[in-house]
Design a protein with these regions (language model features):
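Conserved beta-strand-loop-alpha-helix junction that forms the acyl-donor binding cleft
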Residues: 123-138, 153-159
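Glycine-rich phosphate/pyrophosphate-binding loop shared by adenosine-nucleotide-utilizing enzymes
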Residues: 64-70, 85
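Short amphipathic alpha-helix that is part of the acyltransferase structural core
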Residues: 2-42
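Active-site rim helix/loop that mediates acceptor-substrate recognition in acyltransferases
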Residues: 32-63, 72
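Conserved acetyl-CoA-binding loop of GNAT-fold acetyltransferases
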Residues: 142-152
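Conserved acetyl-CoA binding element of GNAT-fold acetyltransferases
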Residues: 74, 81-94, 129
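C-terminal "cap" of GNAT-fold acetyltransferases
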Residues: 154-230
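Conserved acetyl-CoA-binding loop-helix of GNAT-fold acetyltransferases
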Residues: 92, 98-115, 139, 143
Length: 230
């Protein structure tokens, strides 16, 4: 008999948190363990840098104190030109999927990055890349205000990550679908998060043949409720 509790259970409480420097290895090892070959293999120092810049997020089941999801905003590009940041590392434990937690996390990440972090600049582009055949993040990105920019070939060195295992035989690039965040969508995201907190009371439900599973999500450590002004 497995003594470990289920990843999520009915009535569990879920926290979305910024990851501190001392904890950066938690999301790093989480992704390392669960990566299905669809995410960039980012080095540990990329997670440390993101933690220092308050751009590393983790989703934790407060009831069991176990991590169930991650997200990272990784700086890239030449500081002398248009700044770019890669939104990725979106990974949820398979047993925590189907609730809409990934969509919610991306919304929180983008509202925090643009309105709360103090690091955003109007010329910064937030990009996301999804490898061919990986449909899981598409809905989450579109719901969170990203728009498709078409096929993108990612070469070695384009991002601080190992991509060799994603390159198909005989090729030198990874074929991906590109997305860019539409800054005009930020008001809609704030409104969506306000409704989630004030009308849905932070509760999300996944229908299950064995009975509905209800989770209460709190992201006030990242975005105070008073900052969700519409």
């Amino acid at each position: 008999m497995d003594p470990r509790p289920p990843v999520v259970r009915d009535q569990d409480r879920i926290d979305v948190r910024l990851t501190g420097e001392a904890e950066y290895l938690i999301p790093f090892t989480f992704i390392e363990a669960l990566n299905e070959g669809t995410l960039f293999d980012r080095p540990a120092h990329a997670f440390l840098d993101a933690a220092r810049e308050h751009r590393l997020f983790q989703v934790v089941n407060q009831t069991t104190d176990n991590i169930i999801g991650t997200g990272i905003i990784q700086g890239s590009g030449d500081e002398r030109s248009t700044k770019r940041a890669e939104v990725g590392g979106l990974m949820f434990h398979p047993a925590a999927r189907g609730f809409g937690l990934c969509s919610l996390l991306v919304k929180i990440m983008m509202v925090y990055a643009i309105k709360e972090s103090g690091r955003d600049s109007p010329d910064e582009e937030y990009l996301a890349h999804v490898v061919d055949g990986n449909g899981l993040p598409l809905h989450s990105l579109l719901e969170a205000g990203f728009r498709p920019i078409g096929p993108v070939d990612v070469h070695r060195g384009d991002i601080d990550a190992v991509i060799d295992y994603m390159i198909k035989g005989g090729e030198s690039v990874v074929h991906m679908h590109g997305f860019v965040f539409d800054r005009e969508a930020i008001r809609k995201l704030v409104s969506s998060l306000w409704r989630f907190v004030n009308e849905d009371h932070g509760v999300i439900t996944r229908s299950d043949p064995a009975g509905d599973v209800r989770l209460t999500v709190d992201f006030s450590q990242v975005i105070p409720p008073t900052d969700l002004k519409i």
